[in-house]
């Protein structure tokens, strides 16, 4: 399929948004073509998440309130190894370790080190994990078995205090990235757009922090107003705000830029995929039908990656 640069400009120009946003999108899209050509990668089957803490979490974050833990496999109480074995039998290439946070913002992955090492050695699965905040010792322990560290990077102290409820600050997230990087663990930092009540608050600062540590991939997550949480009545971020973060990231990094599977559904998701593609995203997890349609209209070459997380190159 032949990529048509004029088609991209025409599609961006037809969007119902302001001229400055359109200009930033076109610039970012051209940059993305320079870096990755006409290929766009679609990850239709992300790794299955396994919660190492079951549904337990010491935090009651306003955007989550343990909701997402209830939709993961329960790997607590010695069940991690058996779950990994079943996933391997089903053809899984890797596993995503997650779970509730301790009061300090860390996820106790290291408490399951022996099982994780066995899984990696015996089943040859790729191991990625949501690490949370870590210190040097924890990062060193993680380096024994992690193939990729997935870390939400928050760039605003008030968001950390008021939304996550953690007695920490932006510096702690930067120090965690430094510890993980120094331990030699490949990084796939996650930037959550709209985490602060659906508004931008620290996302661009988070990108500046991430740039210091040479990540493998940068992943863009979009806040989901979730039923049963304090933020269920909040609107998701404006598409223009998501575009602002994506285009900023595309200008800062020459590495893959992924749109996470964690993003709102429905018509918003469909429109988001369109805006994201036109803003320089080169990979999407669980793409919508609209993502396929827009990519074909642009003449992009769709490369489907099966049974793999979008945080991997």
Features from the language model and the residues they span:
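Auxiliary Fe-S-binding modules of radical SAM enzymes
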Residues: 1-30, 35-40, 204, 211-313
């Amino acid at each position: 399929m032949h990529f048509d640069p004029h088609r991209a400009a025409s599609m961006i120009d037809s969007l119902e948004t302001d001229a400055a946003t359109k200009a930033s999108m076109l610039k970012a899209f051209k940059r993305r073509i320079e870096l990755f050509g006409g290929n766009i990668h679609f990850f239709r089957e992300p790794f299955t998440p396994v919660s190492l803490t079951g549904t337990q979490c010491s935090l009651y974050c306003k955007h989550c309130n343990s909701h997402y833990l209830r939709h993961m496999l329960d790997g607590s109480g010695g069940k991690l190894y058996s779950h990994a074995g079943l996933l391997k039998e089903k053809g899984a290439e890797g596993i995503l370790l997650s779970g509730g946070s301790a009061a300090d913002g860390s996820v106790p992955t290291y408490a399951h080190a022996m099982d994780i090492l066995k899984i990696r050695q015996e089943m040859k699965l790729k191991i990625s994990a949501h690490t949370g905040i870590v210190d040097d010792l924890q990062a060193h322990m993680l380096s024994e078995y992690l193939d990729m560290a997935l870390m939400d990077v928050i760039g605003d102290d008030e968001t950390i205090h008021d939304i996550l409820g953690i007695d920490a600050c932006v510096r702690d997230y930067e120090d965690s990235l430094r510890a993980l990087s120094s331990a030699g663990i490949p990084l796939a930092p996650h930037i959550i757009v709209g985490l602060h009540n659906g508004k931008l608050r620290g996302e661009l600062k988070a990108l500046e922090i991430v740039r210091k540590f040479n990540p493998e991939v940068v992943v863009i997550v979009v806040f989901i107003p979730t039923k049963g949480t304090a933020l269920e009545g909040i609107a998701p971020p404006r598409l223009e705000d998501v575009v602002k973060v994506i285009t900023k990231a595309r200008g800062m990094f020459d590495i893959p830029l992924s749109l996470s599977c964690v993003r709102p559904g429905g018509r918003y998701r469909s429109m988001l995929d369109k805006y994201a593609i036109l803003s320089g995203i080169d990979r999407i997890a669980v793409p919508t039908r609209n993502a396929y349609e827009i990519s074909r209209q642009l003449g992009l070459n769709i490369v489907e990656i099966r049974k793999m997380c979008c945080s991997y190159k």
